[in-house]
Amino acid sequence: MPDDVVIRTEKLSRTFSHGGSQQHVLRNLDLEVERGSFTVIMGPSGAGKSTLLYALSGLDRPSLGRVVVDGVDISRLGEDALARFRRDHCGFVFQQVHLLDQLSVIDNLMAVGLLVERSRARVRERCDRLLDLVGLPEADRGKYPAMLSGGEAQRVGIARALVGRPAAVFADEPTGQLNSRYSGMILDLLGRVHAEGQTIVMVTHDLRSALRGSRILYLRDGRIRGELDLGERRGPGGGRVGGGGDDPDGAVDPDGADAPAAPDDAARTTALTAFLAEMGW
């Protein structure tokens, strides 16, 4: 697999059996995801979006075909090896953030980091840097999950997804249960993470969320019906725009304000709207 491709599928199919009938959710998908890209999967309800995300990340197994992630054919791994691969190579962001209630914020991240790194000091340094990145103050890092707002918990969830330096982060409707304030904050954060070179694959039905992507895949009836290359969001200087404008070192605004619009946002919106209309969305 070329170095610039981090995920590849070959004839990927997923079929579920219900009683005496079969439901073909994914049908012979050939797909490549470039390293460092922000790929967005869209489509109507029941199109197979989440099923595809789970197959790409090893949370589900294909009925037929292959899934190769970071050079490893995960469709051939046994259960234990697949679990280790997910732990070491994949980060996950879901609508519901499943933090361990009995552990503080920092210990939730440390528990993940110590699975892949032996040095407690190095893990703590990385966890603190990631919590700085997502804008969670030091005073809040000793809190327990029950003490966090929905937006704070999602920020911690994204930081936790990055602790193990994953080959890709997989996000399934990450703003689906957040209000507009926190949704904007999480989108800014994902943009920041992508601007630093992280590969992201995200499922969404939301136009504003999709605009953060560099590539849009439209799924319907288990097949990729169309693809749109939006390219990277660019600032006035031509650099990637993440969650904090053109400042590459700034953290996401903890108050949840949207990042400044990139000069090409209007053109991107027009292109995406036209594409979705063509797809019958």
Predicted segments, located by residue:
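Conserved ABC ATPase signature
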Residues: 144-148, 152-154
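Conserved ABC transporter NBD signature motif
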Residues: 65-73
